[in-house]
């Protein structure tokens, strides 16, 4: 890492995060002027107004220009989506348990007196709440399932970066002008053209700023850098990039512009090493210093950490630690099925090893063709302990997409949005994080409904759980589709849609079914606790008959505080096998019930003509979802978290080592989980030391690939180090750990999430 990159990192985190009202005020100012116009035009004009008037800056020593806010890591508001939680939490932002922000008293006054009164009763949230039935509201209030993305843009998408970079904005504007001439009544084309032209003007604002700064700059080398930024910006406003610097700059400008449009999480980066390779090679051919090109890439990686998302307190519990979702996958397959690893794949990992920040959320695609040098580079990066890169298995993911009707060529081109959500870059609008389903809560409901049922059998209980899962999936689909329609009718994204295949041919926004692939992704959470509970209940009640069902239910209701409660809990934990130890009897329960969940989910369609797709990952939702579930037959206390990750074993229950964990997860039908899965594994640093340690990790990754698991990620850290960081956070400000599908600064996490990471089993190889 160069001195410049070190200083850029330090400057990014030097000050307290603040909330900026600028986007909200500009958006609102435009919206007041467009009453009566089509929603998509109002949205486009508001975004264009932001691009024209928002304050811009180029910070000291930056090589890549473009900042969403002048102050680093500031949160922005989108009251047009949901003004109510913002009003409720204005005074809580600086002191809340997770993801704190400072906000001035004057900004609070402006929000209360100017912004909120305008958006009250005219936001997307008002529409969604008005459409939700009482039954759906009841289910969400008890957290049987949650409906997400009701308060901001959907995001969770990858634009067609090759189209942007290989054609350039000038050519794209010309194409959109033709569409407008052919169909002048089509508001989507008009809105997209307006925003493409506004994007050009916004980029030219940076060119002018760089020239102004250069004119007064007394540092010769910095003056030349500013003039180069100006030249690149003027070129990018009209022409396709020719060099790596130009490509990185246009790539970042578009990321910032799309943030203004929707204020969404997980506008992810796709297969960065594939579409950026021609520009990297062109710069090398032109004689650029490879060390400078690496510094450019490191600059871009640092920039990815400047965008943080302002979430509600409850949402921050589900998505703790600013998982912005700048996710990129490296390696994988070409469209012809050959290995896609290239020199830029290695450089992306090298640059990350220098920077070691939570974003970008890099991942590596493994397959039978992956070569040893790249696998070892991957293992070397994992060993650093930041949880990056995560690993995805082509041998599972490609068939999973084929099973959903995706073409083979497109399936081989898959990438990931957000945390682990599987998507086809530039061709999918997948609503990948639309809902989370609490499987353990459903079991709890069934247990209580059978109180006093002397005729209850284990098979009868299983059948009731299946039926109840099916019932609540129906309600989850209903709520998800209302949210889907809300985004269509209230929050179209015409600029983003112009970079998604088939939207231009159809003349429709992604929210209106314009994309080639239209999924709705919903996560089943708690499968480890569910199978552990049912296996223990079957053994204790129906096989060994040590307690009656009602006696066990009484112990659970009392949270194991009855005279025999602790003894019962110890037996439930220690005498019955647990998922994650390669024991068929309990693993098969997981496989059967998760398959039932998947097959039920995939029955349903969304308003865009696509189908629902199941996944199993938690982000950090295993903590709040566990807080609403009472004591369970796996020995879990009332309110205790669920198993982390999605497919990970419950904390402390994976006693047979990491290979046994792999074998347990391999018994699940990973191909059905086409919205993504998540498996956390924690290693002690000592087990990966030296060349031998790297080889062991590489062999473990090959076993993961051969066993046909879909995903795995790692923490490599001692629990003692984490405990010290809790006690002396000022000494561990740069400590990055893996949460669930993303990495975060350990000291920025709430204590409940910190404790969760500390308690995870640390394995040895």
Give a label for each model feature:
Residues 214-217, 221:
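A conserved hydrophobic secondary-structure block that centers on an alpha-helix together
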């Amino acid at each position: 890492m160069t001195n410049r990159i070190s200083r850029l990192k330090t400057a990014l985190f030097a000050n307290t995060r603040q909330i900026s009202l600028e986007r909200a005020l500009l958006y609102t100012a435009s919206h007041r002027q467009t009453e009566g116009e089509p929603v998509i035009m109002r949205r486009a004009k508001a975004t264009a107004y932001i691009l024209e008037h928002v304050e811009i800056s180029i910070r000291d020593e930056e090589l890549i220009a473009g900042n969403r806010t002048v102050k680093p890591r500031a949160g922005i508001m989108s009251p047009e989506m949901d003004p109510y939680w913002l009003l409720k939490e204005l005074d809580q932002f600086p002191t809340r348990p997770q993801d704190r922000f400072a906000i001035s008293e004057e900004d609070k006054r402006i929000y209360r007196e100017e912004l909120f009164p305008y958006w009250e009763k005219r936001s997307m949230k008002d529409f969604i709440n008005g459409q939700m039935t009482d039954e759906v509201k009841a289910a969400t209030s008890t957290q049987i399932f949650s409906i997400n993305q009701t308060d901001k843009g959907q995001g969770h998408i990858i634009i067609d970066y090759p189209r942007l970079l290989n054609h350039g904005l000038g050519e794209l504007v010309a194409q959109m002008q033709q569409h407008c001439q052919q169909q002048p009544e089509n508001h989507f084309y008009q809105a997209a053209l307006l925003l493409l032209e506004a994007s050009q003007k916004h980029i030219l604002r940076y060119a002018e700023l760089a020239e102004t700064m250069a004119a007064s700059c007394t540092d010769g080398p910095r003056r030349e850098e500013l003039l180069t930024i100006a030249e690149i910006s003027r070129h990018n406003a009209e022409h396709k990039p020719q060099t790596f610097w130009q490509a990185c700059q246009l790539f970042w400008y578009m990321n910032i512009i799309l943030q203004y449009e929707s204020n969404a999480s997980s506008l992810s980066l796709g297969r960065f090493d594939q579409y950026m390779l021609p520009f990297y090679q062109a710069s090398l051919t032109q004689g650029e210093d490879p060390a400078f090109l690496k510094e450019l890439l490191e600059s871009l990686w640092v920039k990815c950490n400047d965008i943080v998302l302002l979430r509600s307190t409850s949402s921050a519990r589900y998505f703790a630690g600013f998982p912005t979702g700048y996710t990129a996958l490296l390696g994988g397959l070409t469209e012809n099925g050959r290995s896609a690893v290239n020199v830029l794949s290695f450089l992306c990992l090298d640059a990350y090893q220098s920077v070691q920040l939570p974003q970008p959320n890099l991942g590596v695609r493994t397959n039978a063709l992956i070569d040893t040098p790249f696998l070892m580079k991957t293992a070397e990066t994992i060993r650093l302990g930041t949880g990056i890169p995560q690993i995805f298995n082509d041998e599972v993911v490609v068939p999973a997409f084929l099973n959903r009707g995706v073409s083979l060529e497109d399936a081989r081109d898959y990438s990931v949005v957000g945390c682990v959500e599987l998507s086809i870059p530039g061709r999918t609008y997948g609503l990948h994080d639309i809902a989370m389903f609490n499987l353990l809560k459903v079991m709890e409901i069934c247990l209580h409904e059978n109180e006093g049922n002397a005729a209850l059998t284990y098979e009868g209980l299983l059948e009731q759980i299946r039926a109840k899962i099916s019932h609540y999936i129906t309600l989850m689909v209903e709520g998800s589709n209302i949210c889907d329609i809300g985004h269509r009718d209230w929050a179209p994204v015409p600029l983003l849609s112009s970079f998604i295949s088939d939207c231009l041919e159809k003349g429709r926004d992604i929210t209106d079914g314009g994309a080639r692939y239209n999924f709705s992704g919903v996560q089943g959470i708690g499968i480890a606790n569910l199978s552990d509970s049912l296996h223990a209940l079957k053994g204790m009640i129906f096989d060994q008959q040590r307690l009656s069902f009602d006696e066990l239910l009484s112990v659970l209701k009392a949270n194991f505080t009855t005279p025999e409660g602790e003894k019962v809990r110890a037996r439930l934990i220690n005498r019955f096998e647990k998922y994650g130890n390669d024991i068929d009897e309990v693993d098969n329960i997981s496989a059967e019930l998760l398959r039932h969940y998947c097959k039920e989910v995939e029955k349903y369609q969304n308003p865009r003509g696509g189908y629902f797709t199941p996944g199993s990952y938690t982000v950090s939702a295993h903590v709040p979802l566990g807080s609403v579930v009472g004591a369970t037959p796996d020995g879990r206390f009332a309110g205790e978290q669920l198993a982390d990750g999605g497919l990970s074993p419950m904390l402390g229950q994976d006693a047979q080592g990491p290979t046994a964990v792999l074998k347990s997860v391999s018994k699940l039908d990973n191909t059905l989980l086409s919205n993504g899965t998540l498996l956390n594994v924690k290693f002690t640093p000592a087990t990966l030391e030296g060349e031998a340690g790297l080889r062991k990790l590489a062999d473990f990754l090959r076993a993961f690939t051969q066993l046909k698991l879909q995903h795995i990620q790692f923490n490599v850290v001692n629990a003692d180090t984490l405990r010290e960081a809790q006690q002396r956070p000022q000494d561990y400000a740069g400590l990055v750990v893996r949460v669930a599908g993303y990495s975060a600064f350990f000291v920025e996490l709430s204590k409940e999430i910190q404790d969760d990471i500390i308690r995870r089993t640390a394995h040895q190889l």
